[in-house]
Amino acid sequence: MVADVLLTHFNQLFCLNDPGHPLTGQEMKKATIVEDGYIAIKDGLIVALGSGEPDAELVGPQTIMRSYKGKIATPGIIDCHTHLVYGGSREHEFAKKLAGVSYLDILAQGGGILSTVRATRSASFDNLYQKSKRLLDYMLLHGVTTVEAKSGYGLDWETEKRQLDVVAALEKDHPIDLVSTFMAAHAIPEEYKGNPKAYLDVIIKDMLPVVKEENLAEFCDIFCEKNVFTADESRYLLSKAKEMGFKLRIHADEIASIGGVDVAAELSAVSAEHLMMITNDGIAKLIGAGVIGNLLPATTFSLMEDTYAPARKMIDAGMAITLSTDSNPGSCPTANMQFVMQLGCFMLRLTPIEVLNAVTINAAYSVNRQERVGSLTVGKEADIAIFDAPNIDYLFYFFATNLIHQVYKKGQLTVDRGRIL
């Protein structure tokens, strides 16, 4: 077979054999590092991988040849938890955070999520589209090729749908692949204050059926937290969403452990997000139910908290984990997955291989894209992040700097030395 594109002489390729399930426990520690590696691409797919000189049959007169001595390649990075589409920003809350005002106290003062809800409700489709596109551009420039994007800053149908429509438009227009999550249950809107059940009924009866009918989202999510939605309320919504055919995610055990992990396990959610306050019993329940733990260390960093999710304990117990940005205007205003990956080493005490497995193959399972992306595997799409680093460890050792040299998306050179092509 003659390749369209042949990428050769990488110092290292980060490869693994996809076992057909998210990596857990000791599997997280394993990968194949191919020295002097090459990748052959045809019709946007990986058709060959190896070490040394490529087979002669891969090279034809039209084959584009590129050498990458001194560089490493990984699968395109996957950010599987973002709040991509929103209006406004919340830098005015930064001084309060520095003064020690808690996230929940800011929310109680009318700030936090509700502040962004007001800004998002007043924002036009074009405003939201352009703002979200800028964030996606930034992510792409840092090696991200697939992004999960939640609604949740409307808390009314008109605005929630506008957010979902923006995600759908960007999925068509932007090189990054987007996976849509419906999260109208991100907070209790002011007009339903004191009556969350009534709001959930509106979501179930009036919103979810339209989202499903118009194929606006693949997943449904809810914020199960103290002063937001209880475990029973979360179970009520997610069970109805599951009956309608949605895959499930849940924000759980971020600030307090109030039963969100139990809901995730009972309903076989694909992932439970945050988990800073998870208990040993909660870890065991998620393992038993096969729920992926989606950890968001940049949120803990941004909130200046001391309690990070117990990633080391989770992996050693046999749990599958991912790492994501939680990109949002309040608790985590970043879109830099390289920073998140480095926090995975510095703050969660994970190894570079564990982090890379978390943000590639496990993240692909978290967004139900494992058949297409998440590993450098023959037959999968050629989503490739190429770093200006001599080896895998350097990517974490030399921190707080964008080390992306190039990005390939579906076999097309999409980012080249700081420029989107």
Curated annotation (Swiss-Prot):
Binding sites annotated in the UniProt record for Zn(2+): H81, H83, H251, D326
Ligand binding (N-formimidoyl-L-glutamate): Y153, N328, G330
Catalytic reaction(s) noted: 4-imidazolone-5-propanoate + H2O = N-formimidoyl-L-glutamate
Pathway(s) of this molecule: Amino-acid degradation; L-histidine degradation into L-glutamate; N-formimidoyl-L-glutamate from L-histidine: step 3/3
Stored Pfam families: Amidohydro_1
Subcellular location: Cytoplasm
E.C. no: 3.5.2.7
Cofactor note as given: Binds 1 zinc or iron ion per subunit.
GO MF entry, a single one: imidazolonepropionase activity
Gene Ontology terms: cellular component: cytoplasm
Assigned protein family: Belongs to the metallo-dependent hydrolases superfamily. HutI family.
Protein name in UniProt: Imidazolonepropionase
Organism name: Streptococcus pyogenes serotype M3 (strain ATCC BAA-595 / MGAS315)
Phylogenetic classification of the source organism: Bacteria, Bacillati, Bacillota, Bacilli, Lactobacillales
Gene: hutI
